Amino acid sequence: MVTIRLARGGAKKRPFYNIVVADSRNARDGRFIERVGFFNPLARGQEETLRLDLARVEHWVSNGAATTDRVAKLIKDAKAAA
């Protein structure tokens, strides 16, 4: 099953997440099909907190990709901001 989920990056105590489309059998930070955005929970000042390619997300969801709970909330937030 294909899922849209967060893949963790960044340094220790400084998380940065890529929002990726991946096969659910692959590791959290492992191989993915496509990167559709990022989420930076510790953004400061003028830094972007969330960037998401909503067209690609809609494409994957229409093709049967499932989203995790956190990614579903981020998609909702991105749509409200757009």
UniProtKB/Swiss-Prot annotation:
Protein keywords: Ribonucleoprotein, Ribosomal protein
BP GO terms, sorted: translation
Single GO cellular component term: small ribosomal subunit
Keyword Ribonucleoprotein: yes
InterPro entries, per database record: Ribosomal_bS16, Ribosomal_bS16_CS, Ribosomal_bS16_dom_sf
Molecular-function annotations in GO: structural constituent of ribosome
Entries under Gene3D superfamilies matching the protein: 3.30.1320.10
Top-level taxon in the UniProt lineage: Bacteria
Family: Belongs to the bacterial ribosomal protein bS16 family.
Stated name of the protein: Small ribosomal subunit protein bS16
Source species: Shewanella sp. (strain MR-4)
